[in-house]
């Protein structure tokens, strides 16, 4: 079977990822804003006895290296191994797109043109003469539409053309040299694109979509109220996360608790019962139960992304962001940080200014990722009534964003000084969300969350259980056996009283074993570090394990708080937290989690994007100092207020 390697190239926001999803049934992230693809991705499919590997390159307006994403595309086209170029253009904005097409033609590589968003062009009254366009460019032009499954157009034909073009005897230029980007060269490509577009386009423009966009923008992009409208949308999303997801989460939590209690009651081997019930079910179950809240959060953000609203918010906030040393383009990485810090760090590649890029990288971690949400929900649910929980959750996220801005300003004034870049961006048209794309966005992120729960969160929970069980406290065990024997021989006690007394002795033994274990001893030292905020050793240990993944914080607490609580009528997880942790300590714990260093995977990505291990060290010091300082302030402020 022959393999065909296709380089997928196009300007930002032309639907490259949507097209590749339609061709291969992949689930690449799709968004109605520039910078969704920030590194090359590849998918493979079989078509007519050929394995077609499509490499989705970052969107670029021209073949230069002003930004990291543009450099990735240029370097691959010059040095990468591929058989042909599939150039995707926006049919509703052909002239601008053809400037890049003209550059690609000058590489003398086999090329195919996909006229994407053909359905939208038709709706807007734009008619493109594909035969004449093919003659002008000397390549086959295929009209395509990939926005939804129902509206797909010519995806099979496009694959046929890829195979046909690959099979042609024309030779490729093996020594690809991307054309220079001097002003004179840029002007030449722009003029060429303008001439070709005029010759192939006949318009009977239907201005309805533009009128609708203008009317919507008059409201959403209002100079005074636009920001408050955006905050309103975010408040609704967080409130619904707690309102809708919270009910399902409580049901799942109760289900896992029943399962855990059942295992501990029916498994004869006490250690095995504790491992499965407290370690695996208590740890992993505590994490999985928060999935419904995360699904609602992902749904809301995906809707805002696919409609094109997020790009407008970037423009709306540009003035504010510049005052704090950031850039309008910083908004997309920052808002992406609400989902996961890893793609957020990678999304900073769209920033051209080195200092602005580094500032954005350093403050992304203050935008609370979805992995922190279960921690917030657990503690907010423990200390605040359900009626106000959504508002408190919203305030947590807003506080994180405000601190990110303040820290960005401090970094700008002290470390990363220099001129700021002007902000020029393309405003995409408002589009009705593709429910299929929204579904796949939620599906892939939820699946990733569950994979974490089933892999290293599971491993982490088991390790925490073992380290919290061993070594045993032999002296306490000896005392327990002696006192248990005395209780059993005491004729003055009823059977019910004996059972209750034995349970109390067992609970006391478990607590002593826990303090004598590896985790207990290590936690005693950590407790001294966090003593000013009155964090006990269990909270302290969970913060350390949270560096592996923030989801592990909840699973660690689930393991440590379930051990030593052998009462079958024990309260739910929130009740245990409320009983064991003071309100000031709980608030301080939330604040520390908000600001301390991201998970291991995100930290590695940060180091790669920032430029080396020294920046990771700077990030650790920076985030730890910020987290400790704000946590301390929150603790004493809450003590005064409560």
UniProtKB/Swiss-Prot annotation:
Keywords: ATP-binding, Cell inner membrane, Cell membrane, GTP-binding, Ion transport, Iron, Iron transport, Membrane, Nucleotide-binding, Transmembrane, Transmembrane helix, Transport
Chain sites annotated for binding GTP 2: 35-39
An MF annotation (GO) of this entry: ferrous iron transmembrane transporter activity
A cellular component annotation (GO) from this entry: plasma membrane
Keyword Transport tagged: yes
Transmembrane segments: 226-246, 279-299, 361-381, 388-408, 447-467, 541-561, 586-606, 615-635
Keyword Thylakoid: no
Domain FeoB-type G residue range list: 3-168
PROSITE patterns: G_FEOB
Binding-site list for GTP: 116-119, 145-147
Subcellular localization(s) per the UniProt record: Cell inner membrane
Binding-site positions, GTP 3: 56-59
Membrane topology: Multi-pass membrane protein
CDD domains in the record: FeoB (cd01879)
Entry function: Probable transporter of an ATP-driven Fe(2+) uptake system.
Alphabetical list of NCBIfam families matching this protein: feoB
Family label: Belongs to the TRAFAC class TrmE-Era-EngA-EngB-Septin-like GTPase superfamily. FeoB GTPase (TC 9.A.8) family.
Name of the protein this chain belongs to: Fe(2+) transporter FeoB
Organism phylogeny: Bacteria, Pseudomonadati, Campylobacterota, Epsilonproteobacteria, Campylobacterales
This protein's encoding gene: feoB
């Amino acid at each position: 079977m022959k393999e065909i390697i296709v380089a997928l190239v196009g300007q930002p926001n032309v639907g490259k990822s949507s097209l590749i999803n339609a061709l291969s049934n992949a689930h690449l992230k799709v968004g109605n804003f520039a910078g969704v693809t920030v590194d090359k991705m590849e998918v493979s499919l079989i078509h007519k006895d050929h394995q077609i590997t499509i490499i989705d390159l970052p969107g670029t307006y021209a073949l230069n290296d002003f930004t990291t994403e543009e450099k990735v595309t240029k370097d691959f086209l010059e040095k990468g191994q591929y058989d042909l170029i599939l150039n995707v253009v926006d049919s509703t904005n052909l002239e601008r797109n053809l400037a890049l097409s003209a550059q690609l033609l000058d590489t003398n590589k086999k090329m195919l043109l996909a006229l994407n968003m053909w359905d939208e062009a038709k709706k807007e009254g734009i008619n493109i003469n594909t035969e004449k366009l093919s003659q002008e460019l000397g390549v086959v032009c295929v009209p395509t539409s990939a926005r939804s499954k129902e509206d797909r157009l010519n995806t099979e034909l496009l694959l046929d053309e890829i195979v046909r073009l690959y099979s042609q005897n024309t030779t490729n230029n093996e020594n690809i040299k991307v054309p220079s980007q001097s002003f004179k060269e840029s002007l030449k490509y722009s003029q060429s694109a303008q001439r070709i577009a005029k010759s192939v386009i006949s318009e009977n423009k239907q201005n309805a979509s533009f009128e609708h966009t203008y009317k919507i923008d008059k409201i959403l992009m209002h100079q005074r109220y636009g920001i408050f409208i955006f905050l309103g949308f975010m408040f609704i999303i967080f409130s619904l996360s707690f309102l809708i997801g919270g009910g399902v989460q409580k049901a799942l939590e109760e289900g896992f608790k029943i399962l855990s209690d059942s295992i501990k009651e029916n498994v004869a081997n006490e250690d095995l019962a504790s491992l499965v019930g407290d370690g695996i079910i208590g740890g992993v179950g505590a994490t999985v139960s928060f999935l419904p809240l995360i699904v609602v959060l992902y749904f809301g953000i995906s809707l805002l992304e696919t409609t094109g609203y997020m790009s407008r918010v970037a423009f709306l906030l540009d003035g504010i962001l510049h005052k704090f040393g950031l850039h309008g383009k910083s908004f997309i990485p920052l808002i992406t940080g609400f989902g996961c810090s890893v793609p957020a760090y990678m999304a900073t590649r769209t920033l051209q200014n080195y200092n602005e890029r580094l500032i954005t990288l350093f403050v992304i971690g203050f935008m609370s990722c979805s992995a922190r949400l279960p921690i917030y929900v657990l503690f907010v649910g423990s200390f605040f009534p359900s009626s106000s929980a959504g508002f408190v959750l919203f305030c947590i996220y807003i506080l994180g964003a405000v601190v990110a801005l303040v820290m960005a300003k401090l970094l700008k004034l002290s470390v990363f000084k220099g001129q700021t870049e002007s902000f020029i961006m393309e405003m995409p048209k408002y589009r009705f969300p593709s429910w299929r794309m929204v579904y796949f966005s939620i599906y892939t992120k939820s699946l990733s969350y569950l994979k974490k729960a089933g892999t290293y969160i599971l491993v982490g929970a088991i390790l925490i259980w073992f380290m919290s069980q061993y070594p045993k406290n032999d002296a306490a065990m000896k005392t327990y056996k002696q006192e248990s024997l005395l209780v059993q021989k005491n004729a003055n006690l009823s059977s019910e009283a004996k059972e209750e007394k034995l349970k109390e002795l067992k609970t006391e033994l478990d607590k002593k074993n826990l303090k004598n274990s590896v985790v207990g001893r290590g936690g005693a030292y950590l407790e001294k570090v966090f003593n000013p905020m009155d964090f006990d050793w269990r909270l302290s240990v969970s913060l350390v394990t949270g560096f592996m993944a923030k989801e592990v914080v909840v699973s660690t607490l689930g393991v440590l708080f379930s051990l030593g609580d052998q009462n079958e009528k024990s309260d739910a997880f929130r009740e245990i937290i409320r009983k064991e942790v003071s309100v000031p300590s709980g608030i301080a714990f939330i604040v520390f989690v908000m600001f301390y260093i991201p998970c291991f995977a995100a930290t590695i990505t940060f180091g790669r994007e920032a430029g080396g291990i020294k920046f990771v060290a700077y990030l650790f010091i920076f985030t730890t100092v910020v987290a400790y300082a704000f946590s301390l302030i929150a603790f004493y402020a809450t003590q005064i207020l409560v």
